[in-house]
């Protein structure tokens, strides 16, 4: 049983473990505390996102979607090992799970089969979503697995927990398969070895890129709201391609698509290659400032 870490303490714990951490938007106040209790905390739960692409995955986990409001976890672990903090407090990640599993986590004993869904896991578990399609084919880079190990160990170290306080979603709720592609027993072994030693200490963050990396074509869809879209729109206006009546703004719109199509035509694209949906080459040439 433990009082949840404050935003500052969580951030410090992760960085002290050697992780590169990005604070995403207003993560410190992004939570579901108005829908239910947060704490006491008992463990860490690992998930996969069933998505690809860092930027779109982070936005999804921050905002959630119509069927499941965000945040969908506390941190998103990217393929390159970067941890993007998206929530602080209760998050929609664990759902209902097995009370026998919770008792085993608290006692730090071997887990029983998860055959019931009768206990609110969002109250008791920190959640990390890891960017992976979850199809058993999408690879888990070494940097990402190391970051999962470090992130889970960081929270455990801050609370004085052992590796048995870390579980996968598939060990909590019947029918879940995540994380798929590595075993939780192997990950717990890694976490246990790490906890036997001292934390790695703060890492030097890589330099922030000058321009926004291409977030993938699927990022540009109806319902998307992101400061990246605003920054893109401002660059389109600067290039003489703005087709806005009002804006640019954060919500992806028909005006954004028409403006981007004008940019594609300016670059010499025609037909379906100038449909207004960004591609990597045209995006890189637009040089959208980092936000």
Can you say where each PLM-predicted feature lies in the sequence?
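Basic/polar, cationic surfaces and motifs that engage anionic cell-wall
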Residues: 1-23, 34-38, 116-127, 131-219, ...
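Acidic, Ser/Thr/Pro/Gly-enriched interdomain connector segments
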Residues: 197-250
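Alpha-helix N-cap/helix-initiation motif
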Residues: 65, 137-141, 249
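N-terminal catalytic cores of peptidoglycan-degrading enzymes
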Residues: 1-121
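Oligomerization/assembly interface segments of phage tail-like spikes and tubes
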Residues: 46, 126-130, 226, 230
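LysM (lysin motif) carbohydrate-binding repeats in extracellular/periplasmic proteins that recognize
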Residues: 238-243, 254-270
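Acidic, glycine-anchored loop motifs typical of Ca2+
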Residues: 248-250, 273-276
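Short strand-loop junctions, especially beta-strand C-caps/beta-turns
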Residues: 49, 131-133, 249
């Amino acid at each position: 049983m433990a009082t949840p870490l404050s935003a500052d303490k969580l951030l410090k714990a992760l960085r002290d473990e050697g992780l590169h951490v990005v604070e995403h938007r207003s993560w410190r106040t992004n939570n579901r505390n108005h829908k239910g209790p947060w704490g006491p905390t008992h463990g860490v739960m690992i998930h996969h996102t069933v998505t690809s692409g860092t930027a779109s995955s982070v936005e999804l986990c921050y905002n959630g979607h119509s069927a499941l409001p965000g945040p969908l976890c506390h941190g998103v672990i990217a393929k390159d090992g970067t941890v993007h903090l998206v929530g602080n407090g209760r998050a929609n990640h664990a759902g209902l799970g097995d009370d026998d599993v919770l008792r085993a986590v608290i006692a730090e004993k071997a887990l029983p089969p998860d055959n019931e869904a009768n206990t609110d896991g969002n109250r008791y578990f920190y959640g990390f979503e890891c960017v992976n399609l979850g199809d058993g084919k999408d690879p888990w880079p070494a940097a990402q697995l190391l970051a999962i190990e470090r992130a889970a160990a960081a929270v455990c170290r801050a609370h004085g927990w052992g590796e048995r306080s870390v579980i996968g979603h598939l060990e909590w709720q019947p029918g879940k398969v995540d994380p798929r592609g590595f075993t939780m027993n192997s990950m717990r072994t890694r976490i246990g070895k790490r906890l036997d030693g001292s934390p790695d200490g703060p890492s030097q963050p890589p330099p922030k890129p000058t321009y926004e990396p291409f977030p993938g074509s699927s990022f540009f869809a109806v319902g998307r709201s992101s400061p990246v879209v605003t920054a893109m729109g401002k660059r389109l206006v600067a290039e003489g391609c703005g087709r806005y009546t009002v804006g640019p703004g954060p919500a992806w719109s028909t005006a954004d698509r028409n403006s981007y199509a004008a940019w594609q035509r300016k670059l010499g694209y025609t037909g379906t290659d100038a449909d207004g949906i960004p591609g990597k080459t045209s995006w890189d040439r637009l040089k959208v400032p980092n936000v």
